[in-house]
Amino acid sequence: MQTYLVGGAVRDYLLGLPVKDRDWVVVGADAQTMLAQGFQPVGKDFPVFLHPKTHEEYALARTERKTAKGYAGFSFHADKDVTLEQDLMRRDLTINAMAQDADGKIIDPFGGQRDLAAGILRHVSPAFAEDPVRILRAARFAARYGFEIAEETIKLMRQMVENGEADALVAERVWQELAKGLMEKNPRKMIEMLRECGALQVLLPEVDALFGVPQRADYHPEIDSGIHTLMTLQRAADMGLSLPERYAALLHDLGKAKTPPDILPRHHGHDINGVEPVREVNQRLRAPRQCAELAELVCRWHIIFHQVGQLKSQTILNVLKKTDAFRRPERFQTALNVCIADTQGRLNREHTPYPQRAHWLALLEAANQADSGKIAAECRAQGKAHFIAEQIDRARLAQIAPLQKAFRGA
């Protein structure tokens, strides 16, 4: 019985990165051997055990065989006769198919160290094509490390998409990988790689449809709506924004793909036109509520947020109410963060100031100075409870108006 550190722990060690989770593979053992040594079985689908002291995962070396479409269509064979190299061969990428023995020696039968040094993501074997999740994983690793995907691997990924493997992906797995990719250092790279292999058209056709749609050069020197979306997403990442904010950045301009060709490169109403596509993506991916709600909010209101200097006080109050800013100020603030990414996610506009954010927050704070509780009590005391909402609005407008006048005159 021999144990080896495998996968991501070896990869990150060689990259000089912190090793977060350590996974082990056991060669020359079976389930009875593991149980006899005090290991606790935890794997439902595979023979995986927890170490009795460290509680790290130890898996028996295994081989896999494709039995049906999709990521779950596999059977496996785990026994004492399965070698380390056979176990490593079933893994997705060469950089993930390395092991380290107890003496610190690296076992690298497929050139993972070479590809790490070159910044290349390359599939280990044709078996890569048996699991469609690997399309997403390869794109996600590109986003994490900034690596390029080998041309032969991109070609294989294209074939997988053409063969319908991406169609077999369930929403939960797509969201899981997408969410991880969005939180990587370079999420733009993930979307680019998915587009290059054709998977974006299958998984996020609403985003894919943005590429090639022109915008006004005076507002968007990058011209292409898809490129702007990538730049906005990357700016959100560079700002250190949260997953809901990055997801909203990815979907904020879906309405531009709905613009009638005869009015291009203008996009009147793309904020409103984008709401339905955003909802469709949310439903298809089963996006978490916080992500889904923020994406829809940003899509619908980002143009109004940008144009605050042109708005009347009554319109501002209406926006604050419709966006639920009084009850959910934190969400309102995150929406404005995405608007910064939208403004700066343009060619040579990375450092464009965005005073609108501070002004919107100041307007909200001013409107909150109106004592709604006191107003409600006074109305009830006068037998005019039906005037409560109207009186609160008047008090809020009285706070908003001078602030807005000063901002517009600045």
Swiss-Prot record:
- UniProt binding sites for CTP: 8, 11, 91, 137, 140
According to the UniProt entry, what is the EC number of this protein?
2.7.7.72, 3.1.3.-, 3.1.4.-
A single GO BP term for this record reads: tRNA 3'-terminal CCA addition
Q: Please give the cofactor(s) recorded in the UniProt entry for this protein.
A: Mg(2+); Ni(2+)
A Pfam family per the record: HD
> Where, in this chain's numbering, is ATP bound?
8, 11, 91, 137, 140
Q: Name one GO molecular function term.
A: magnesium ion binding
What reaction gets catalysed by this protein?
a tRNA precursor + 2 CTP + ATP = a tRNA with a 3' CCA end + 3 diphosphate; a tRNA with a 3' CCA end + 2 CTP + ATP = a tRNA with a 3' CCACCA end + 3 diphosphate
Q: Does the record carry S-adenosyl-L-methionine as a key word?
A: no
- Gene3D superfamilies recorded: Beta Polymerase, domain 2, cca-adding enzyme, domain 2
Chain segments annotated as transmembrane: none
- Source organism's superkingdom? Bacteria
Q: Which of this chain's residues are annotated to bind Mg(2+)?
A: 21, 23
Keyword vocabulary terms for this entry: ATP-binding, Hydrolase, Magnesium, Metal-binding, Multifunctional enzyme, Nickel, Nucleotide-binding, Nucleotidyltransferase, RNA repair, RNA-binding, Transferase, tRNA processing
**Assembly state and interactors?**
Monomer. Can also form homodimers and oligomers.
PANTHER family membership: MULTIFUNCTIONAL CCA PROTEIN (PTHR47545:SF1)
The protein's role, per its UniProt record: Catalyzes the addition and repair of the essential 3'-terminal CCA sequence in tRNAs without using a nucleic acid template. Adds these three nucleotides in the order of C, C, and A to the tRNA nucleotide-73, using CTP and ATP as substrates and producing inorganic pyrophosphate. tRNA 3'-terminal CCA addition is required both for tRNA processing and repair. Also involved in tRNA surveillance by mediating tandem CCA addition to generate a CCACCA at the 3' terminus of unstable tRNAs. While stable tRNAs receive only 3'-terminal CCA, unstable tRNAs are marked with CCACCA and rapidly degraded.
Miscellaneous notes for this chain?
A: A single active site specifically recognizes both ATP and CTP and is responsible for their addition.
What family classification does the UniProt entry report for this protein?
Answer: Belongs to the tRNA nucleotidyltransferase/poly(A) polymerase family. Bacterial CCA-adding enzyme type 1 subfamily.
- This chain belongs to the protein called Multifunctional CCA protein
Lineage start: Bacteria, Pseudomonadati, Pseudomonadota, Betaproteobacteria, Neisseriales
